């Protein structure tokens, strides 16, 4: 029914940010707003981000040097026209934990073409209707291998 005030409220969600600083700011503001609204309404309120049991995913931020290396390797293999720079993703990604510990570059491969139902209907990777063009998989594997081989070739003496 409308206008009924519940005894208690509990809700959850996912927070995403392009930077770790942005995530910290979101957490700070959510806590301030929840506690402030509880105080205004003369009731108790609190926030539990469950950081002890479920660490927040850090932002995936490419290291500039590793990004330049990965892009150069991909362009060498595919040509400059075969590489597109995409906007930063808002997804929660395990790779952020790696990137926080060492210079890293996160990139994706295009797996659609004009004939796949995913491309025609704009189905994203989380859709049950998402279909990939499997011909892209060997190309993606080759790009990943080229990035690794080029890196090892350049840095073999320092390892």
Where are the model-predicted features located?
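Metal-dependent amide/peptide-bond hydrolase catalytic core
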Residues: 1-159
């Amino acid at each position: 029914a409308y206008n009924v005030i519940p005894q208690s409220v509990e809700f959850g969600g996912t927070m995403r940010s392009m930077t770790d600083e942005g995530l910290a700011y979101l957490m700070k503001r959510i806590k301030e707003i929840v506690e402030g609204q509880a105080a205004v309404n003369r009731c108790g309120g609190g926030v539990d981000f469950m950081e002890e049991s479920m660490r927040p995913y850090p932002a995936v931020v490419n290291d500039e040097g590793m990004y330049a290396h990965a892009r150069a390797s991909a362009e060498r293999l595919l040509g400059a026209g075969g590489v597109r720079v995409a906007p930063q993703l808002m997804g929660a990604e395990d790779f952020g934990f790696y990137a926080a510990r060492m210079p890293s570059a996160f990139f994706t491969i295009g797996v659609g073409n004009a004939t796949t139902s995913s491309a025609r209907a704009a189905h994203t990777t989380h859709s049950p209707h998402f279909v990939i063009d499997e011909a892209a998989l060997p190309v993606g594997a080759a790009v990943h291998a080229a990035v690794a081989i080029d890196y090892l070739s350049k840095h073999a003496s320092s390892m």
